[in-house]
């Protein structure tokens, strides 16, 4: 069970709109090695652990990854929340903006949406 604190683990306070940077950082949210996949890997793999203390460590790590996910989403949101139409056009953010406006959507920097195919969970605790 989690105890959610309504604050970020590390404060994020970005004042400047920068859709180019958001396009790069968003891969840390939904890219193949991003926080969403990492949290799911740890929280899923914990069930294969025969030792409760190791299971607990994986739960802790997966929970930590969720905190990272929240920070990454906050960064992307703050970088795009005040976009002007000119910034959308100039930055190349248009394709993302058409589908999601300034919403935060899990995808790689390449535009490939997050997929559960990027993580694995097996019953063997060694692999």
What do the PLM-derived regions correspond to, one by one?
Residues 1-127:
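Non-heme di-metal
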């Amino acid at each position: 069970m989690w105890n959610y604190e309504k604050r970020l683990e590390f404060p994020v306070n970005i004042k400047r709109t920068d859709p180019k940077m958001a396009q790069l950082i968003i891969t840390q949210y939904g890219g193949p090695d991003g926080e969403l996949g990492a949290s799911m890997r740890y929280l899923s793999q914990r069930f294969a652990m025969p030792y409760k203390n190791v299971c607990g460590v994986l739960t802790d790590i997966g929970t930590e990854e969720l905190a990272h996910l929240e920070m990454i989403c906050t960064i992307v949101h703050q970088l795009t929340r005040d976009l002007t139409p000119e910034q959308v056009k100039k930055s190349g953010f248009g394709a993302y903006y058409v589908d999601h406006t300034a919403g935060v959507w899990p995808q790689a920097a390449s535009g490939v949406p997050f997929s559960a195919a990027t993580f694995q969970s097996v019953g063997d605790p060694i692999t």
